[in-house]
Amino acid sequence: MTSRAPSPPTPPCPSPPALKSSPSPVPTATPASPPLKPLSNPLPPPPPTPRPSTSAGPSTPLPPPALRSSPSSALNASRGAPSTSPPPSSSPPSSPASTPPSRTPSPTPTAPASPVASTAMTPASPSVPPPPSAAPSSSAALSSAPPPSTAPLPRHEPRPPPPLPPPLQPPPGVRVPRSVAFPLPLARELPPLRLPPAPYLHPLLARLAPLRLRPPPDLPSPPLSPPLSPPLSPISPLHAPAPPPHPDPVLLPALSLAISRAAPDLLRLLSLLSPPSLFLLFTLLSIHFSPFPIFILLSLLLLLQFPRT
């Protein structure tokens, strides 16, 4: 504590009184004296001191040094408690000036800005009256023009429907059915209606009318599940091929006569063939011909195989 107390008081003590004493007696000598003293004291900033002196007269530099001394005093107060004791001991007038800015730093910066604000307000004050003057003018315009306020009301109201055109009267020779409620624009172009009653239009139409009203036939619905019986084999009677057509009965006598005449020669030929070849021959004949002549040939073959005893 003892080491901190003597070190801070020595630099700040000369700086605040010198800054305040130089501008107060002679405002003109302030620019020369402050730069020399701040150079000796590195703590306070040298550039801010000449700016307030040049910007304003003797009245303005008084608050800025107090403002700049107040941050230094506030920094000293934050660093150590004994820093606050040297300023009052050095000069009594500086203590009251330093204490209020330290307590309320916000109002002091507004003091130099107050003339600027006042100057800004002064031009604004003449500009403020014109809006009131314009307001009465707008109100007078609104009061003088009531029709625009009432004009939008009819826009929102439903418009009346357009008048309907007069119905066209058909020519004297045209008969219009009474069921037609709307006017016919082409009534003059229509030919005279001479239709008979509905039941006597046409006999075909009368017959087809009930057929059209009948419901469609019931189609067989597909099976929901597969049948329990096994699938039909290709040899089943349902899928068997149709047999070849039988010979015409008129040709049967001629066929029998031809076979009887050719029987001896056929029997001789069949006797020369072996049994396997005969079986093959009968099979081919049964495929391409009806079974009746094959039965005859087979009977003849049996007669040849078993001759008379």
Swiss-Prot record:
Region of interest: Disordered: 1-174, 216-240
GO CC list: host cell membrane; membrane
Pro residues bias spans: 1-17, 24-51, 84-112, 160-174
Main location: host cell
Topology with respect to the bilayer: Single-pass membrane protein
Entry's transmembrane regions: 278-298
Biased composition (Low complexity): 67-83, 113-125, 135-144
Localization annotation: Host membrane
Domain of life of the native organism: Viruses
Signal sequence, renumbered to the chain: none
Keywords, sorted A to Z: Host membrane, Membrane, Transmembrane, Transmembrane helix
Name of the protein in question: Uncharacterized protein ORF3
Organism for this UniProt entry: Grapevine fleck virus (isolate Italy/MT48)
